[in-house]
């Protein structure tokens, strides 16, 4: 596994555990379709949450959350709509969150959950 893929997988594991500890239920991981991938899909009460996970091992290239651009948010909205259609899912509300994971040199993770970014 490439280093970039390994740190991404690490971040997604950390993010999933973080969300579950916060009371969300992760219902899908790494959902793929020809248009792209959703890292995590979760339920927060009656709200369906589409989660983009961004992981970095340093701040040299900025905060992980800064990597989610307007273009990326537009893609996430399209992917969320496709996921909802393909799963015939119904939710009172839908939201897009970002979980930013910074892996420190000591191997610990600093996690920031940004709710409703899209």
Curated annotation (Swiss-Prot):
Please indicate which superkingdom the organism of origin belongs to.
Bacteria
Q: Which InterPro entries match?
A: Restrct_endonuc-II-like, tRNA_endonuc-like_dom_sf, UPF0102_YraN-like
- Single GO molecular-function term? nucleic acid binding
What family does the database annotate? Belongs to the UPF0102 family.
NCBIfam families from the UniProt entry: PRK12497.1-3, PRK12497.3-3, YraN family protein
The protein's name: UPF0102 protein Bcav_2532
Naturally occurring in which organism (per UniProt): Beutenbergia cavernae (strain ATCC BAA-8 / DSM 12333 / CCUG 43141 / JCM 11478 / NBRC 16432 / NCIMB 13614 / HKI 0122)
| Phylogenetic classification of the source organism | Bacteria, Bacillati, Actinomycetota, Actinomycetes, Micrococcales
